[in-house]
């Protein structure tokens, strides 16, 4: 797996592991579990550290992993373009681009459906549809 986003001599993967350890509660466990599912869904995923949060990429950003007091939020950057038959997306539903999964303490996310969503995001990024179109100059 490639690593990107090194900071202060630490790789992005090390910074993500550090964040998980610092959380030390259900949020750290949840973020760790979701990280494992992302890696299982895409062995070529690139871990990055941006905006003080974990970011997983493959030909573009797949999702970020944010931790707040009451939730762990996985924001899919092109989520509005993805099919979500399992209805995992439960946040940021009104926008034209992003979709998010908010996970509260005690909640479980369907692992198979989540991995399918990650694979779909990778396929979308790799298709070139995720790249902004270039406007013609007049």
Each language-model region and where it sits:
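Charge-dense, helix-prone N-terminal extensions
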Residues: 1-138
């Amino acid at each position: 797996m490639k690593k990107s986003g090194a900071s202060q001599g630490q790789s992005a993967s090390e910074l993500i592991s550090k964040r998980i350890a610092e959380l030390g509660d259900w949020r750290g466990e949840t973020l760790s579990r979701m990280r494992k599912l992302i890696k299982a869904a895409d062995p070529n995923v690139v871990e990055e550290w941006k905006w003080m949060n974990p970011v997983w990429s493959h030909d573009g950003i797949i999702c970020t992993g944010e931790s707040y007091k009451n939730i762990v939020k996985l924001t899919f950057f092109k989520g509005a373009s993805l099919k979500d038959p399992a209805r995992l997306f439960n946040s940021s539903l009104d926008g034209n681009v992003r979709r998010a999964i908010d996970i509260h303490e005690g909640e479980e996310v369907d692992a198979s459906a989540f991995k399918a969503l990650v694979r779909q995001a990778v396929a979308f990024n790799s298709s070139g549809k995720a790249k902004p179109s270039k406007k013609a100059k007049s």
